[in-house]
Regions:
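Structural microenvironment flanking redox-active thiols in thiol-disulfide oxidoreductases
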Residues: 1-52
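Short, solvent-exposed loop/turn and secondary-structure capping segments
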Residues: 30, 112, 179-181
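Thiol/selenol-based redox catalytic cores and closely related redox-interacting motifs
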Residues: 43-118
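C-terminal/domain-terminus segments
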Residues: 113-131
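Extracellular/lumen-exposed scaffold segments
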Residues: 126-293
């Protein structure tokens, strides 16, 4: 389980971890033993805490209720509950997601998805929150204009995994690269240009806040990055049955593309650059073994 694998890193960041489920103590105990889980698993077998947090999946009950044959209900079940159809055993489940809670019990951020099979990884959440990570499976490079380190948030993914390809960039002395908004003035914004994989979709790049650079010769004010920064290219593994079938025949997925940017110093704007990059992540299949409730 990915969360267990990141437990030590989370603790180093001063974070505690707990997971809550509608399952019984016995079911959670069986799961923890099989998967080597050492952090607290909280049994909310009447779903009272889940309901109090406002994340009770009401579609699960609709799927076995009087309107179970309604096409709209069946479509909702496939999206929010299970691709395998409704089942009374699923009633009481929460919408899957992550809450970040401070020491006073206040929710400071939350991460939830519409499609029940899509899940943010722990390290993806940490990157989104700006927490430092030690790059894994990193690709390092240097050009005349900048240094970069590119790495995936996770080295293994499964059906529906939402993860990121991170790019740490350090512009050279007196250099800057362009941030979103600079394209309006004809400059190339730094970013990834990933080839579309068969079993995943590519989300928009997430950029940090930029600064405004004044280029006196042209009397221009342009958004740029001059200090070290990180951009995130999010990738979401497809969660449908066909994607799962394809993944079952593969051991790994290689994502290929280019790092695109244009750099300038205080006097010269250099030609746009395109640097080939690739990332390989292992593929794992979901664990559907379940103890009886």
């Amino acid at each position: 389980m990915e969360l267990q694998g990141q437990l030590e890193i989370l603790r180093e960041q001063g974070l505690g971890v707990a997971a809550i489920s509608y399952d019984s103590v016995d079911v959670l105990s069986d799961f923890a033993q099989r998967r080597g889980i050492t952090f607290p698993l909280l049994a909310d077998d009447d779903s009272s805490a889940i309901a109090e947090f406002g994340i009770l999946n009401t579609v699960a009950a609709e799927g076995v209720g009087d309107n179970a044959d309604d096409p709209d209900v069946q479509a909702d079940v496939a999206k929010y509950v299970s691709a395998f159809g409704a089942n009374p055993m699923i009633v009481g489940t929460p919408y899957p997601g992550t809450f970040m809670i401070d020491s006073d019990g206040k929710v400071t951020s939350r991460f939830f998805e519409e499609f029940y099979r899509e899940r943010n990884t722990t390290t993806n959440v940490m990157l989104k929150l700006g927490m430092g990570l030690s790059p894994i499976a990193a690709v390092e490079g240097e050009t005349a204009h900048l240094k970069f380190t590119a790495y995936p948030s996770n080295t293994s993914v499964t059906v529906g995994t939402r993860f990121s390809l991170a790019l740490d960039v350090t512009p050279g002395p007196n250099m800057h690269v362009y941030a979103p908004g600079a394209e309006d003035k004809g400059y190339r914004v730094i970013g990834f240009n990933l080839d579309q994989p068969e079993i995943a979709r590519i989300a928009p790049v997430t950029y940090p806040e930029s600064e405004i650079y004044y280029f006196e010769p042209l009397d221009e004010h342009v958004p740029v990055y001059q200090e070290k920064f990180t951009i995130l290219q999010e990738v979401v593994m497809n969660g449908d049955a066909r994607a799962e079938e394809v993944m079952s025949t593969l051991d790994a997925l290689t994502l290929t593309g280019t790092l695109e940017y244009q750099a300038c110093d205080d006097a010269i704007c250099f030609l746009p650059q395109s640097i080939p990059v690739s990332f390989t992540v292992d593929l794992e299949m979901p664990d559907r073994q379940r103890a009886n409730r």
